């Protein structure tokens, strides 16, 4: 092989390391290519793989999300948060409606839903709520297909969704729950300055982790192949540095330009960086003094504009 010829990597190992979790090892890569490919694949896997999620629901006897449900242990907000944990598979449909109706005391799970043809729930044991006594409980939910994260639209007081008691949910469509990568040193013959890319990916069970990587690579290929036909030669870009934490997450919360009320509430909780904020869950933020649902919606909308969301798992983030 000529000294100027780039090495062609190959997949040397695919190992299942847990439920819906796999580790893929790729080598050899030219120095710096491990971080280049790892960063690109990670971003695409988190933001661009198609999936399904519940986007709205109606609960009999409930008019708004701050209600308490008679005979139900959880309040409405907790029920909505539990609905987000349901992993749905809907390959041939864009939108579907699912229903459940129970009357007996005990746990209500995703397996209680009546599903139309073409819709599957892969975690039927997911708990939605608990009935404290024998009473009727009915819930209707809308499932939609999408990509990335979508903040629930805010309905006007006179809108149709408000009159019909529709509860809208923020939707995380990505079937990828966690993606992490690391780069180690590789060797080929006398060369020891090469990269080995190791990717660990966990899905919600609706997609095989290996298939998710293939889909991400296909998306990248389709986006980049347009440059192959360029006639002019572009300037070479510098190799990416070995970044372990996205610089955006290190920026102060003030850069989000939140309202004074929201910003002061976050500072009072020692939430100083964007990374500190996205690691918090909705439930945790709602426990913050003086931070209500309006401020929470503002925070979620601003984060969504930066392709971020609450409850993110950030690798290597320093613990407080």
From Swiss-Prot:
InterPro entries in alphabetical order: DNA-dir_RNA_pol_insert, DNA-dir_RNA_pol_RpoA/D/Rpb3, DNA-dir_RpoA, RBP11-like, RNAP_asu_C, RNApol_insert_sf
One matching Pfam family: RNA_pol_L
Region of interest: Alpha C-terminal domain (alpha-CTD): 245-320
GO biological process: DNA-templated transcription
Presence of the UniProt keyword Phosphoprotein in the record: no
Top EC category: transferase
Keyword Nucleotidyltransferase attributed: yes
Catalytic activity: RNA(n) + a ribonucleoside 5'-triphosphate = RNA(n+1) + diphosphate
A cellular component annotation (GO) from this entry: cytoplasm
GO molecular-function terms, A-Z: DNA binding; DNA-directed RNA polymerase activity; protein dimerization activity
Signal sequence extent: none
E.C. number(s) listed in UniProt: 2.7.7.6
Region of interest: Alpha N-terminal domain (alpha-NTD): 1-231
Keywords: DNA-directed RNA polymerase, Nucleotidyltransferase, Transcription, Transferase
Record-stated family: Belongs to the RNA polymerase alpha chain family.
Summary of the function given for this chain in its UniProt record: DNA-dependent RNA polymerase catalyzes the transcription of DNA into RNA using the four ribonucleoside triphosphates as substrates.
UniProt domain comment: The N-terminal domain is essential for RNAP assembly and basal transcription, whereas the C-terminal domain is involved in interaction with transcriptional regulators and with upstream promoter elements.
Known partners and oligomeric status: Homodimer. The RNAP catalytic core consists of 2 alpha, 1 beta, 1 beta' and 1 omega subunit. When a sigma factor is associated with the core the holoenzyme is formed, which can initiate transcription.
Name of the featured protein: DNA-directed RNA polymerase subunit alpha
Organism: Dichelobacter nodosus (strain VCS1703A)
């Amino acid at each position: 092989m000529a000294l100027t010829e780039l090495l062609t990597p190959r997949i040397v190992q695919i190992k299942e390391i847990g439920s819906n979790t796999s580790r893929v090892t790729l080598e050899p890569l030219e120095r710096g290519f491990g971080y280049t490919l790892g960063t690109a694949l990670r971003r695409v896997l988190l933001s661009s793989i198609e999936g399904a999620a519940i986007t709205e629901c109606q609960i009999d006897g409930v008019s708004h999300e701050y209600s308490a449900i008679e005979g139900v242990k959880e309040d409405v907000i907790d029920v909505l948060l539990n609905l987000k944990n349901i992993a749905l598979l809907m390959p041939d449909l864009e939108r579907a409606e699912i229903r459940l109706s129970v009357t007996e005391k005990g746990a209500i799970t995703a397996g209680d839903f009546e599903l139309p043809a073409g819709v599957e729930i892969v975690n039927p044991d997911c708990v939605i709520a608990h009935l404290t006594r024998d009473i009727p409980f009915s819930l209707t939910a809308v499932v939609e297909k999408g990509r990335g994260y979508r903040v629930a639209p805010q309905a006007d007081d006179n809108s149709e969704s408000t009159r019909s008691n529709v509860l809208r949910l923020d939707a995380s469509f990505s079937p990828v729950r966690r993606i992490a990568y690391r780069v180690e040193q590789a060797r080929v013959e006398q060369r020891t300055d090469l990269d080995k890319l190791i990717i660990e990916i966990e899905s919600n069970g609706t997609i095989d982790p290996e298939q998710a990587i293939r889909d991400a690579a296909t998306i990248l290929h389709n986006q980049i192949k347009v440059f192959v036909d360029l006639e002019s030669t572009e300037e070479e870009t510098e190799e990416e540095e070995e970044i372990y934490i996205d610089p955006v997450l290190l920026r102060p919360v003030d850069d989000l330009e939140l309202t004074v009320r929201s910003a002061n509430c976050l500072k009072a909780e020692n939430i100083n960086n964007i990374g500190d904020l996205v690691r918090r869950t909705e439930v945790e933020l709602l426990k913050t003094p003086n931070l209500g649902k309006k401020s929470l919606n503002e925070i979620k909308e601003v984060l969504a504009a930066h392709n971020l969301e609450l409850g993110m798992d950030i690798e290597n983030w320093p613990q407080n």
